[in-house]
């Protein structure tokens, strides 16, 4: 299924990262926090301003982003894969 988010929404797939302690010990999955990095899969057309103009989003498909994981981030299953749908304002940075 193809998904097209509306307005300033962004669809993100979590990017799992191996977690190690400072001493080099790999943490098991249940001892790790969920990563707050992901790959942008789809973006909406943009934020609608009070003037009625549409401001395009700063992120684009393929970007690796760092985001706030919490209230306002919707988890959905698309074709058996968990994705996150969030507002662009929930994205803190683009990793380059």
From Swiss-Prot:
Organism: Chromohalobacter salexigens (strain ATCC BAA-138 / DSM 3043 / CIP 106854 / NCIMB 13768 / 1H11)
Record keywords, A-Z: Chaperone, Cytoplasm
PANTHER family found in the cross-reference section: 10 KDA HEAT SHOCK PROTEIN, CO-CHAPERONIN GROES
Cited PROSITE patterns: CHAPERONINS_CPN10 (PS00681)
GO cellular component: cytoplasm
GO biological process: chaperone cofactor-dependent protein refolding
Places the protein is found: Cytoplasm
Role noted for this protein: Together with the chaperonin GroEL, plays an essential role in assisting protein folding. The GroEL-GroES system forms a nano-cage that allows encapsulation of the non-native substrate proteins and provides a physical environment optimized to promote and accelerate protein folding. GroES binds to the apical surface of the GroEL ring, thereby capping the opening of the GroEL channel.
InterPro entries assigned: Chaperonin_GroES, Chaperonin_GroES_sf, Chaprnonin_Cpn10_CS, GroES-like_sf
Domain of life: Bacteria
Stated name of the protein: Co-chaperonin GroES
Family classification: Belongs to the GroES chaperonin family.
Any GO MF annotation of the entry: protein-folding chaperone binding
Pfam family, one: Cpn10
Subunit-structure text: Heptamer of 7 subunits arranged in a ring. Interacts with the chaperonin GroEL.
Primary gene name: groES
Keyword Cytoplasm found: yes
